[in-house]
């Protein structure tokens, strides 16, 4: 339960003035915002940053040359971003999500205090596989974070802050705290200071980036905003946007360049907090009047007639108003992505997906908070690894449905699903999922099993080393709207299942048919290896009773193989 002092502190919006001590040396970089605003009720001022009134975080490298811990600003995202009329489009659990980020080159100790509360509550760090050393004193929790060249992204959860979400019974923090420890930036992700081809807008309202002749836009530390009726449309000359550590930009990015590479990098924040849900630029950034899929993306680009790579490194995105990313143009076969150390937080609105992974994409070392499709498997030759995912109440962790496709050679590996909270079958639950053809089932759900394409195949797919902590939905719910061949589910663990009564945990794969000729869709070589529920390994003999894999149609059951 929150302390009375905390409730009183948060009952009014006010600006915090604090003499913070931050680090800026070769071992550690932390940052602060002097315009932090503690406010959980309304939108914050344009030039302010919503700050946690509960958590205080300080960081020290180890071994330390002194006893000094350096302040690290704790950001906060809330459902609806303080816009009361937008709460109807959020997940409805009234949770908040705080986070802090720092750069480091040595092992570090993170000191966490709760304002108005003692530290006399055990914490769990998720993913639990990290096994970071934790110690306590009367006021704070101390977590040792070893240095890693790929960083760490994790959740710190106090036992006395956990709430039970109905009807799944999932135990989740009411006031989440995420820690993002990242390696220092290098010349490939940080522009040279004073480059003649760069422009650095002044903090405040940003204008004119659609007409600049610069190739690089640099957001230095400070607070920037585009308002809820504008976004960052970049001129065709701009190929790089850099968000410095300590930069906080309220807006969304749209590239018009058709260059061979466009890039967004840096360890600042891009926040969609000023936008309403499903903000449609063609309708004055108000909620779209229909399901036109034209909601504002946090990342958008336009292709020309040649190939392009979108490089995304280090940035934290908060409060996306809709799907996170889309490119458009002559052929999406021309776009690929390289994504590293990316974080998405505060995705409380519905339809807040993970990133698109276009052909050839490599995505790694990512934290996702999503309330729709997580890892979107729509294209070939894609690798995604080292993902931490906090799944809200809609759509599976991996989605590869909506329309028949030819997709091959995909590897998703080392994925920690630290939370799920599905309510019913209509949420499209599951670790691995493929919903129905959207042309005939707009919400992905339909009893029509004749919407497939027998001339298309998803093949040579490996989903390996997935770990679902806490209560989980089904291993898979797959509507095979095209043929499936050589699908490998390997080393997946589920700690426990959600209640059987809410119809989210049984795996199924019903028989499917071609839309035009009635031909049966085929499934060949579908293997499940090293799947565990709790401490039990799932085999053919206990797949239905323990693994809850009891909905595979007899037409496909002979192609599903279990390997201990």
UniProtKB/Swiss-Prot annotation:
Protein modification: N-glycosylated.
Top EC class, one word: hydrolase
Q: Which GO terms describe its molecular function?
A: isopullulanase activity
- GO CC terms on record? extracellular region
EC numbers on record: 3.2.1.57
Q: Which residues cross the membrane?
A: none
What is the organism of origin for this protein?
Aspergillus niger
Q: Name one Pfam family in it.
A: B_solenoid_dext
Tell me what this protein is called.
Isopullulanase
Q: Which residues form the signal peptide?
A: 1-19
Task: From the UniProt record, report the name of the gene that encodes this protein.
Answer: ipuA
Sites where a glycan is attached: 24, 94, 115, 138, 186, 210, 305, 381, 448, 455, 460, 486, 491, 503, 535
């Amino acid at each position: 339960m929150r302390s009375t002092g905390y409730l009183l502190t948060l009952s009014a919006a006010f600006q915090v003035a604090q003499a913070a001590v931050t680090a800026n040396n070769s071992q550690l970089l932390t940052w602060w915002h002097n315009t932090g605003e503690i406010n959980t009720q309304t939108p914050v001022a344009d030039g302010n940053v919503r700050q946690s009134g509960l958590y205080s975080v300080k960081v020290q490298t180890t071994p330390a040359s002194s006893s000094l811990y350096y302040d690290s600003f704790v950001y906060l995202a809330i459902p609806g971003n303080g816009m009361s009329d937008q709460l109807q489009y959020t997940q409805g659990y009234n949770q908040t999500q705080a986070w802090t980020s720092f750069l480091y080159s040595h092992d570090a100790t993170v000191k966490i205090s709760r304002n108005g509360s003692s530290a006399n509550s055990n914490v769990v760090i998720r993913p639990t596989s990290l096994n970071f050393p934790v110690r306590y004193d009367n006021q704070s929790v101390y977590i040792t974070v070893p240095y890693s060249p790929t960083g760490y992204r994790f959740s710190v959860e106090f036992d006395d802050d956990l709430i039970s979400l109905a009807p799944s019974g999932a135990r989740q923090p009411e006031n989440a705290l995420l820690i993002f420890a990242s390696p220092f930036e290098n010349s490939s992700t940080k522009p040279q200071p004073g480059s003649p081809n760069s422009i650095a807008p002044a903090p405040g309202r940003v204008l004119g980036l659609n007409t600049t002749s610069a190739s690089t836009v640099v957001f230095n530390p400070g607070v920037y905003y585009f308002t809820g009726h504008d976004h960052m449309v970049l001129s065709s000359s701009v190929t790089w946007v850099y968000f410095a550590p300590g930069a906080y930009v309220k807006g969304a990015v749209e590239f018009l360049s058709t260059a061979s590479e466009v890039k967004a990098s840096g360890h600042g924040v891009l926040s969609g907090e000023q936008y309403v849900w499903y903000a449609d630029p063609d309708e004055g950034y108000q909620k779209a009047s229909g399901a036109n899929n034209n909601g504002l993306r946090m990342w958008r680009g336009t292709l020309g007639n040649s190939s392009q790579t979108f490089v995304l490194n280090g940035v934290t995105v908060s409060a996306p108003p809709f799907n996170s990313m889309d490119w458009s143009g002559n052929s999406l076969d021309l776009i690929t992505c390289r994504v590293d150390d990316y974080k998405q937080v505060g995705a409380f609105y519905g339809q807040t997906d993970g990133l698109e992974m276009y052909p050839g994409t490599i995505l790694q070392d990512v934290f996702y908070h999503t309330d729709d499709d997580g890892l979107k498997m729509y294209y070939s030759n894609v690798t995604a690894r080292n993902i931490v995912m906090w799944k809200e109440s809609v759509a599976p962790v991996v989605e590869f449905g909506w329309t028949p496709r030819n997709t091959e050679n995909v590897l998703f590996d080392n994925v920690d699903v630290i939370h799920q909270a599905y309510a019913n079958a209509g949420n499209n639950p599951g670790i691995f999922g493929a919903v129905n053809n959207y042309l005939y089932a707009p919400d992905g759900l339909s009893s029509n099993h004749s919407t497939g394409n027998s001339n298309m195949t998803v093949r040579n797919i490996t989903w390996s080393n997935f770990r679902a902590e806490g209560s989980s939905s089904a291993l898979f719910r797959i509507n095979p709207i095209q043929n499936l061949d050589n699908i490998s589910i390997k080393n997946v663990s589920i700690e426990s299942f959600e209640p059987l009564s809410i119809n989210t945990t049984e795996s199924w794969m019903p028989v499917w048919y071609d839309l035009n000729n009635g031909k049966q869709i085929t499934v060949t070589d579908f293997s499940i290896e090293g799947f565990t529920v709790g401490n039990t390994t799932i085999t053919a003999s206990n797949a239905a009773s323990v693994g809850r894999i009891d909905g595979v149609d007899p037409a496909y059951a002979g192609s599903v193989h279990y390997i201990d």
